[in-house]
Amino acid sequence: GIFEGQNHTISGLYFKQENTSEVGFFGYNGGKISNVGILNSYFCGFSRVGGVCGYNSSTITNCYNKGVVDGTADAAGSFGGVCGCNLGILTNCYNTGIVKGQLFVGGVSGDNIKTITNCYNTGIVSGQSYVGGIDGDNSGTITNCNNEGKVSGTEDYVGGVSGDNNKTITNCYNTGIVSGQSYVGGVNGYNQNGTIINCNTTGEVNGTGSHVGGVIGMNLSKGTITNCYYDSTVYTGAAIGDDMGTTEKVEGKTIEQYKTGEVAYLLQLDQSDEVWGQ
């Protein structure tokens, strides 16, 4: 089916079912949801909880959440501001609300298996492990997205864009504070078999354990990171906490290099569409 919101907003929803999965304005979407905003609402469940949709297998476009997404203490996972678990396409969506849970927690999507494009988060995102400003656990593609919200995990796999990455992150950036225990990075906490290209972070990175980096916490042997930068004035440690994979042009830049436009130039280099600007 098709839900066309016509730029209207939905306000005052309250749903708290601690043993329920697929919770949101729509619990499950197999059609098309577009042009709707969720305000002053609260969604709490066991797994797959999102402000707009709990579980998406199709398309969500031009939607946003300004409500609270919450997971119970013994929750299974997949909590996102827009969508809890995404097996479809999220485009031009954003979250400004609080998102909290245990595992797989993200500002836009908790668990992304397909596509997130042109989305952003400014809300506070917190969880235990697999926590990210855009997505908690990525095995799909994340493109042209940015996080400005505070991201925190009490344990591991925490990143400004994605906590854990197994596929592709391109043209994304983070300006929010990122905090966790181990495997913590300004862009991504744990890059397993994924590719991260043309990404940038200027937010603080704080890790109390091991494998902490300005860009990536840990890059495994099958991981690839290319043309990614971080503000070395804000975070004075290494770009990658532990690098076992393939890297090229992954380094810190000073605030002066950001101000002159050098970093924007490097990120835009060789791209036909204008993505990065000063």
Task: State the predicted function of each range.
Residues G1-Q278:
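Predominantly extracellular beta-rich ligand-binding scaffolds that present long acidic/polar faces
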